[in-house]
Amino acid sequence: MKWSDPKYLIVFLITLVLVAGEARYDILGGYDRLATTLGICIATEVVLSWWLRGRVANIASAYITGISLALLTKPQANILWPFALGAFIAIASKYVLIYRGRHLWNPSNFAIALLVLVASDSVAILSHQWGNDLRINLIIWAFGLAVAWRARVLHVTLTYVACFVLLAAVRNAIVGGPLLAELAPITGPMYQLFVFFMVTDPRTTVSTRRGRMLVVAIVALAETIIRLGGDFQVALLRPFYPSPPILALAIVGPIAMWWDLYRQGRKAT
């Protein structure tokens, strides 16, 4: 096991987000939530990998998924079932929702999107910002960008961030208000998890560099459309209002992944 492997650097990064968020803002809301998501994610990964593939998978992926779910899922007080169900759905999706041997959704993205869509009255998404704590932002973004570079997905992160900033300016020009209010969300832990762990997930991104950049640009555009839908009260988009980036990726990502795998299969034949 090489600790310089991007997989373990990503484990360290998400642990850093967890520790910083919990120490500064108590964003977990209870360690029972963390124990539930981590325990079920790891147990499900171990059981399904052994049962379906004949070997126990590396649990680093389950750990990352568990931390993401524990941080991002914010249900009504004192209920644990969204964490338990979300953890099981996230890991199970890797073994069920597959095409040509690859899963189509990032596990935590799929689970959170599903929970928000079907149980929006009970489940919300983390909305904390890091406020004016520049040190936390600098540390997490600096390490996150370094990990993205080491994992060779820096172009994905930077493309999404650039598109987010550009489209935030466009939305601001349309609806008005302070531009900083449009840009502020990307400094928070939800977007840090999104740009460093979801849109860059190697197992659910397309095969070419240009394709990956195009996909995240479309995700950012879809997110902006959802946000504008909220501004103008478009009823058709109402189910997507709780978390535009999560739901935009849940729609665009698997379609792009399926098409990429389909094209590769046709070329092979």
Residue ranges and their predicted role:
Residues 55-131:
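Membrane-interface helix-loop-helix junctions at boundaries between adjacent transmembrane segments
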Residues 43-54, 89-103, 142-152, 196-206, ...:
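C-terminal ends of transmembrane helices
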Residues 25-40, 72-86, 122-138, 179-192:
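Structural signature of hydrophobic alpha-helical transmembrane segments
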Residues 55-62, 80, 100-110, 154, ...:
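Short, non-helical or kinked segments that cap or interrupt transmembrane helices
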Residues 1-13, 168-269:
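C-terminal transmembrane helix-loop-helix hairpin of multi-pass membrane proteins
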Residues 119-170, 176-177:
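Internal active-site segments that recognize and position negatively charged phosphoryl groups
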Residues 1-50:
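N-terminal signal-anchor module of multipass membrane proteins
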Residues 13-15, 33-45, 61-70, 82-90, ...:
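Alpha-helical transmembrane segments in multi-pass membrane proteins
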